[in-house]
């Protein structure tokens, strides 16, 4: 869905790093190097960014009106 605001494990703020991360990775940079440049050092935070799949555009079609 949408990237969580904080890491599930340590509580560190990660949402502010999502857009620069995905932009640079889509441009062809190495994800590990991008995370290092953004200051994401903990492996729990790194996995939150590396393993996230943004599927909100697919799920939005299945919502029903309230």
Swiss-Prot record:
Cofactor dependency: Zn(2+)
InterPro entries: RNA_pol_su_RPB10, RNA_pol_suN_Zn-BS, RPABC5/Rpb10
Top-rank taxon: Archaea
Pfam families linked: RNA_pol_N (PF01194)
Its EC number(s): 2.7.7.6
Cofactor note: Binds 1 Zn(2+) per monomer.
Keyword terms: Cytoplasm, DNA-directed RNA polymerase, Metal-binding, Nucleotidyltransferase, Transcription, Transferase, Zinc
Presence of the UniProt keyword Ribonucleoprotein in the record: no
Catalyzed reaction equations: RNA(n) + a ribonucleoside 5'-triphosphate = RNA(n+1) + diphosphate
SUPFAM superfamilies per record: RNA polymerase subunit RPB10
GO biological process: one example: DNA-templated transcription
UniProt enzyme class: transferase
GO molecular function: DNA binding; DNA-directed RNA polymerase activity; zinc ion binding
Role, per record: DNA-dependent RNA polymerase (RNAP) catalyzes the transcription of DNA into RNA using the four ribonucleoside triphosphates as substrates.
Designated name of the protein: DNA-directed RNA polymerase subunit Rpo10
Organism: Saccharolobus shibatae (strain ATCC 51178 / DSM 5389 / JCM 8931 / NBRC 15437 / B12)
């Amino acid at each position: 869905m949408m990237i969580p605001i904080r890491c599930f494990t340590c509580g560190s703020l990660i949402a502010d790093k999502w857009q620069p991360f995905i932009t640079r990775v889509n441009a062809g940079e190495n994800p590990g190097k991008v995370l290092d440049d953004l200051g994401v050092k903990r492996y729990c935070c790194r996995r939150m960014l590396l393993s996230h799949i943004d599927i909100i555009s697919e799920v939005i079609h299945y919502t029903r009106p309230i």
